[in-house]
């Protein structure tokens, strides 16, 4: 059978329209389309009255540029200094910095009207599902919180204190060895970024399973720690293609990074089973752990949920606390007067390091203030945790009407460094947190704009444990050591890049035995 009759229209069409003409026509149509969208976004979009740079209101190019650079947090800070407490930083994305915005976006009353934005913090499972407390579903989130809450209660956290002390004591012993090897006059130059990352990873895995990965003992990152850093980094990259689900799923599947991490988590669970079985045979009582508490829960998690939640706890519990310890130790080193006051408070409270305990540490106001000020200066999540308005008709957020589908958040770095909210916002002054003892010049600071653990239904479930880890670690280090920082050793930290979390810029401190720098305090 002949199909020559199919050839004549094609020949006629392509004889009158060239390929180049088709390409030019397509380009013109696409340009006109994008121009129409830009005009709409600038002149007619419901967010048109929100202040911000004109280009950001019509295009996502500036957003991607600064996100890719790693300096989005500093860019947004400059925008808020220019435009005020509410800024449009993308066609459908709004950044806030006020305390009112914290309550309106993250508060309990809005938990079904404002949900996590999956494009801003995409899942690293190939099908986009989440089986952990970071889930996008408010119903699943409530379920996981209910099961996990007993693991992080005041009673449970107190049971973990022994584990915290054991791990911190290992770090102190390592640092003392290093000082002994070096020249007493110069002390020992220590990369505290690595030490604190190893320590917090050891602590969180020990708290999770009753046994750590021994990063401090081996003085190197366990493969599981390296994978957790890869997971965080990869999630920051995936933001670029989160809107294209097919490509995102392909890249996630191609990397396989979460699967490797979950495999290690599961092997740790199996190891815990073997240890628990041995303890049952010998009658020995095992250490308190999150995993043992989860196994004993009345509504136990299935395997995928167990893997997902333990993965989330390990990554969040080590990454953020390790950085907070690095920041606090660095700022104390950079401000000798602050170091002397913090060290004096700790050393006056305890006759020996063995007496240090968390109940007593809670009563030390300056130690707490030193940590709080470091969390203000360098919040663990500098760019904000995005939420999306999902209710029809929109919502009023901090006095601005925000339509459905808009991504909204409080930019923590911008809020914490705002000159409208803080006196000397870029300087480290723990005394601003001392309540009645706060100096006059800091009494108008808007301290409620600082929420390092978020608030409302999504408040960090492990904040009590994190505070214990930070108090015990810093107190023992302040009791044992003096430290300072040399001129160039803090530059990388001061200019660190950040995506979902900060890059690991090395902070090198000069560590000395107690009294070597500042005498008896």
From Swiss-Prot:
Keywords: Antibiotic biosynthesis, Glycoprotein, Heme, Iron, Membrane, Metal-binding, Monooxygenase, Oxidoreductase, Transmembrane, Transmembrane helix. Pfam families: p450 (PF00067). Glycans are attached at residues 178, 186, 191, 309, 416. The chain crosses the membrane at residues 19-39. One of its GO terms (cellular component) is membrane. One of its GO terms (biological process) is antibiotic biosynthetic process. Its EC number is 1.-.-.-. One of its GO terms (molecular function) is heme binding. Heme binds at residue 460. The keyword Aminoacyl-tRNA synthetase does not apply. It is a single-pass membrane protein. It comes from the Eukaryota. Its cofactor is heme. It is found in: Membrane. Pathway: Antibiotic biosynthesis. InterPro entries: Cyt_P450, Cyt_P450_E_grp-I, Cyt_P450_sf, Cytochrome_P450_monoxygenase. Cytochrome P450 monooxygenase; part of the gene cluster that mediates the biosynthesis of sordarin and hypoxysordarin, glycoside antibiotics with a unique tetracyclic diterpene aglycone structure. First, the geranylgeranyl diphosphate synthase sdnC constructs GGDP from farnesyl diphosphate and isopentenyl diphosphate. The diterpene cyclase sdnA then catalyzes the cyclization of GGDP to afford cycloaraneosene. Belongs to the cytochrome P450 family. This is Cytochrome P450 monooxygenase sdnF. The lineage of its organism: Eukaryota, Fungi, Dikarya, Ascomycota, Pezizomycotina. The gene is sdnF.
């Amino acid at each position: 059978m002949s199909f020559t009759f199919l050839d004549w229209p094609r020949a006629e069409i392509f004889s009158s329209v060239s390929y180049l003409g088709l390409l030019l026509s397509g380009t013109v149509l696409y340009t006109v389309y994008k121009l129409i969208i830009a005009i709409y976004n600038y002149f007619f979009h419901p967010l048109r009255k929100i202040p911000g740079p004109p280009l950001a209101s019509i295009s996502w190019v500036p957003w991607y540029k600064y996100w890719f650079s790693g300096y989005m947090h500093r860019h947004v800070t400059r925008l808020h200094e220019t435009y005020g407490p509410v800024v449009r930083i993308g066609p459908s994305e709004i950044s806030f910095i006020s305390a009112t915005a914290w309550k309106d976006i993250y508060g309990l009353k809005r938990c079904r009207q404002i949900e996590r934005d999956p494009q801003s913090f995409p899942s690293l499972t190939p099908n986009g599902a989440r089986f952990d407390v970071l889930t996008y579903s408010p119903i699943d989130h409530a379920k996981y919180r209910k099961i996990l809450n007993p693991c992080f209660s005041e009673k449970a956290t107190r049971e973990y204190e022994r584990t915290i002390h054991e791990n911190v004591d290992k770090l102190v012993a390592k640092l003392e060895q290093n000082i002994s090897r070096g020249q007493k006059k110069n002390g020992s130059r220590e990369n505290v970024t690595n030490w604190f990352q190893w320590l917090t990873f050891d602590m969180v895995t020990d708290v999770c399973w009753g046994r750590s990965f021994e990063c401090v003992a081996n003085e190197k990152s366990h493969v599981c720690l390296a994978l957790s850093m890869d997971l965080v980094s990869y999630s920051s990259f995936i933001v670029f293609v989160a809107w294209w689900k097919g490509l995102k799923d392909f890249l996630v599947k191609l990397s396989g990074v979460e699967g490797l991490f979950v495999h290690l988590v599961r092997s740790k669970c199996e190891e815990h089973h073997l240890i628990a079985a041995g303890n049952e045979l010998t009658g020995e009582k095992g250490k308190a752990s999150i995993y043992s508490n989860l196994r004993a829960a009345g509504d136990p998690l299935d395997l995928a949920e167990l893997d997902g939640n333990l993965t989330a706890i390990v990554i969040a519990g080590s990454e953020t606390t390790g950085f907070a310890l690095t920041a606090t130790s660095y700022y104390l080193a950079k401000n000798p007067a602050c170091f002397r006051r913090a060290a004096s408070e700790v050393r006056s409270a305890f006759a020996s390091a063995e007496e240090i305990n968390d109940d007593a540490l809670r009563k030390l106001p300056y130690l707490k203030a030193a940590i709080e000020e470091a969390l203000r200066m360098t919040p663990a999540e500098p760019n904000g945790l995005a939420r999306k308005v999902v209710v029809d008709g929109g919502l009023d957020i901090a006095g601005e009407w925000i339509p459905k589908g808009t991504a909204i958040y409080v930019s923590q770095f911008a809020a914490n460094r705002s000159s409208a909210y803080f006196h000397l916002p870029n300087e480290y002054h723990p005394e601003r947190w001392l309540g009645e003892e706060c100096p006059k010049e800091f009494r108008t600071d808007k301290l409620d704009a600082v929420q390092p653990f978020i608030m409302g239904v999504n408040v960090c479930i492990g904040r009590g444990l994190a505070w214990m880890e930070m108090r015990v670690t810093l107190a023992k280090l302040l009791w044992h050591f003096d430290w300072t920082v040399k001129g160039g050793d803090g530059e990388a930290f001061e200019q660190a890049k950040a995506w979902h979390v900060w890059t690991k810029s090395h902070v090198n401190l000069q560590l000395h035995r107690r009294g070597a720098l500042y005498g008896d305090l």
